[in-house]
Amino acid sequence: MAERTFIAIKPDGVQRGLVGEILGRFERKGFKLVGLKQITPSRALAEQHYGVHKERPFFAGLVDFITSGPVVAMVWEGDGVIASARKLIGATKPLEAEPGTIRGDLAVNIGRNVIHGSDAPETAEFEIGLWFDAAELNDWTPSDQTWRVEA
């Protein structure tokens, strides 16, 4: 199986109508969408997801923000998808993100940076398992697969 990553469009991205734009960037890159849902996360889910930041001063505000509205949770699959997705997303601080990246083009403030992406294989596995049941992930072959990747 190819590598998988967890990507979430945060409430600011959903409210600003950026879902289609962001989905399109991943599709045009050639990655395969294997899981997709819109959910308003519970506090428990948000606290688990951002647990690594629990002792940081911004933790409570981050949890409040991510639970403030709908999030579009996704699982994308493809060779090198974790590293490539991080490049597509851009730097955490939007003002440091390169033009052409999602954050570089669509965000200004670190507290409203539109999107989350797993940063490592272990993180991706944890986040996918946290946000999705195995039955919610689809194993399928796109009709244009031979035009995207070499066998």
Curated annotation (Swiss-Prot):
Compartment(s) of residence: Cytoplasm
Keyword Cytoplasm: yes
GO cellular component, one term: cytoplasm
GO biological process, one term: UTP biosynthetic process
UniProt keyword list: ATP-binding, Cytoplasm, Kinase, Magnesium, Metal-binding, Nucleotide metabolism, Nucleotide-binding, Phosphoprotein, Transferase
Residues involved in ATP binding: K10, F58, R86, T92, R103, N113
SUPFAM superfamilies (alphabetical): Nucleoside diphosphate kinase, NDK (SSF54919)
Recorded catalytic activity of this chain's protein: dZDP + ATP = dZTP + ADP; a 2'-deoxyribonucleoside 5'-diphosphate + ATP = a 2'-deoxyribonucleoside 5'-triphosphate + ADP; a ribonucleoside 5'-diphosphate + ATP = a ribonucleoside 5'-triphosphate + ADP
Record EC number: 2.7.4.6
PANTHER family from the UniProt entry: NUCLEOSIDE DIPHOSPHATE KINASE
Protein task: Major role in the synthesis of nucleoside triphosphates other than ATP. The ATP gamma phosphate is transferred to the NDP beta phosphate via a ping-pong mechanism, using a phosphorylated active-site intermediate.
Complex formation: Homotetramer.
Homology family: Belongs to the NDK family.
Record protein name field: Nucleoside diphosphate kinase
Source organism per UniProt: Parasynechococcus marenigrum (strain WH8102)
Gene symbol of the encoding locus: ndk
